[in-house]
């Protein structure tokens, strides 16, 4: 019997060897090395957590938080290190999306007869 977790753990190890993963790692280091970028990233992370909490609880985001997010987003777009991090993250998420398609294909194939 196959242990699917062994395959998943191997995939996780292989992921760390991809160019996309390495690009995110390099971008994270660049943000960490710059105090302004690191502080801005921390603020961005905090406001995103507030947004997610509001979405999960169904509560609207306060006007103050909306304004803070818009101002912070404008600052983020001007910070080359964070922009590079976000772009590298997108590359990694694109790769993960392709991987997800590959490992969910057998599941989708099971339903093919029902869809036709």
UniProtKB/Swiss-Prot annotation:
InterPro entries: Com_YlbF, YheA/YmcA-like_dom_sf
Xref: Gene3D superfamilies: YheA/YmcA-like
Pfam (any one): Com_YlbF
Domain of life: Bacteria
Family, similarity comment: Belongs to the UPF0342 family.
Official protein name in the record: UPF0342 protein lhv_1666
Taxonomic lineage of the native organism: Bacteria, Bacillati, Bacillota, Bacilli, Lactobacillales
